[in-house]
Design a protein with these regions (language model features):
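Substrate-agnostic recognition of the 12-TM MFS/MFS-like secondary transporter fold
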Residues: 18-34, 58-71, 77-92, 109-168, ...
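Flexible cytoplasmic inter-helical loops of multi-pass small-molecule transporters
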Residues: 140, 191-215, 409-413
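Juxtamembrane transmembrane-helix termini
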Residues: 43, 99-102, 106-109, 195-199, ...
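Hydrophobic alpha-helical transmembrane segments
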Residues: 107-114, 118, 143-202, 263, ...
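Cytosolic histidine kinase catalytic core of two-component systems
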Residues: 15, 49, 139-140, 173, ...
Length: 414
């Protein structure tokens, strides 16, 4: 029998292990869906603005519903909630696959289905995050957060490259069929788990429960600032991913090159996740978080310079791969450190709402893409990303200088 310890310690718990393996299927489906939707839409419209609209459709419903999704996750059985969300996303992606296969799909089909999936994600993400501590012991939280991050990051590393090959040898409808299978796999995993997770929240209306979670974050400086920084990390630091089809055109890349460029972000994130285990217990955890966030911005600047100056060259492509790799590694390190601090400090009865609010930050990548897409119409695609990176730098500098509660965070007391 395999014994798990250290960074893999959380895998010794059977329910977490099952949840983790199921997450590979559903998260892989999510990554493939994002890639295929963007490629299909750009193929139909050749418009960066439409990519921005797709980003808005993929983020705004999640932002609107996550607060209520967190309240629901605190009130009912989280496993049953995940059963429902997984099944609904399975149906939506199956519908999109049929539309695409029949060649009757339109840009607005893509936008509407992306918005519907985003709406459901507003309920799925809080449950997915809040259920995790129930599957492990507290002392394995660092391991569980890192392993969960590896699911997302390895999917970003592997799936786009495979997706690019799928687009070369088949079509986008094949990608949507695989996405359907991925979400259905997670549905089957949750169905197989004999686990009861009743809600713990107090009585009250949904709005009152949401307000309770918001008040907690507002009055706890550590939670408030780390949540703001997480939103900025995704909205400013990852906005470029939404515009990758446009950057691929700038670099004269085909489908496989597009896939490998996105995969570089996944490789970087996995590298950051593997490195973070050596720093989680650092007495300078707060300073380390700020430093990794700041350093990621300078690699974003490098990416924008290469796509502005060299453009159609193998050298530009190689340097861009290196820049997005490093930026993703550093941003991943920050996000894992921030989420672990929150997971360990949040009261159990507020977990769904507080982590749901934090989880809204993951929708800010596409929303940042909307802002970048709009800015690109006035400057350039590269210039738009540089502007967002500068906003991120300014925020990090302000927090580093103004808030000692973050600078002085220690992993030894978390």
């Amino acid at each position: 029998m395999i014994e798990f310890s250290g960074r893999l310690g959380a895998l010794k718990y059977p329910f977490f292990r099952r949840y983790w393996l199921g997450s590979f299927a559903s998260v892989g489906a999510t990554q493939l869906q994002v890639m295929a939707l963007g490629w299909l839409l750009f193929e139909l419209t050749e418009s960066t603005l439409m990519l921005g609209y797709l980003g808005a459709a993929a983020s705004i419903p999640t932002l609107a519903m996550t607060l209520f999704g967190g309240a629901l996750a605190d009130s009912i059985d989280k496993r049953k909630l995940m059963l429902g969300t997984s099944f609904l996303m399975t149906l939506l992606l199956a519908w999109l696959a049929v539309l695409d296969y029949l060649e009757i799909v339109t840009p607005w089909h893509i936008i509407v289905i992306a918005a519907a999936i985003s709406f459901i994600t507003g309920f799925d993400w809080p449950a997915r995050t809040a259920i995790m501590p129930s599957l492990i012991e507290r002392d394995e939280m660092f391991s569980a957060v890192a392993l969960s991050a590896i699911v997302w990051q390895s999917s970003r590393m592997i799936v786009p490259a495979l997706g690019g090959l799928i687009l070369v040898v088949a079509d986008t409808w094949v990608a949507f069929v695989l996405c359907t299978a991925g979400f259905f796999s997670m549905f089957l995993v949750m169905l197989s788990m004999n686990l009861k997770l009743p809600g713990l929240s107090s009585q009250g209306s949904p709005l009152e429960k949401v307000a309770e979670g918001v008040r907690f974050i507002w009055h706890e400086p550590t939670f408030l600032i780390l949540t703001i920084l997480s939103f900025a990390a995704m909205g400013f630091g990852f906005a470029y991913i939404q515009l990758m089809p446009a950057f691929s055109a700038i670099l004269s890349l085909d489908e496989s090159g597009y896939g490998f460029l996105i995969s570089a972000t996944g490789f970087g994130s996995v590298a950051g996740t593997l490195l973070i285990g050596d720093f989680q217990r650092s007495k300078n955890l707060g300073r380390l978080m700020l430093a990794t966030a700041l350093a990621s911005c300078f690699f974003l600047y490098g990416f924008t310079v290469m796509t502005s100056i060299l453009k159609h060259s193998d050298l530009a492509f190689a340097i861009c791969i290196g820049c997005v790799f490093a930026a993703s590694a550093l941003n991943s390190m920050f996000m894992i450190m921030a989420l672990t601090v929150l997971q360990l400090r949040v009261p159990e009865e507020l977990r769904g709402r507080v982590l749901g609010i934090h989880g809204m930050c993951y929708s800010f990548g596409p929303l940042g893409g909307l802002a970048a897409g709009a800015l690109a119409g006035y400057v350039t695609t590269s210039g738009a990303i540089a502007v967002l990176a500068s906003c991120y730098v300014a925020l990090i500098a302000f927090i580093a200088l103004r808030y000692s509660v973050i600078r002085n965070l220690s992993g030894q007391t978390t």
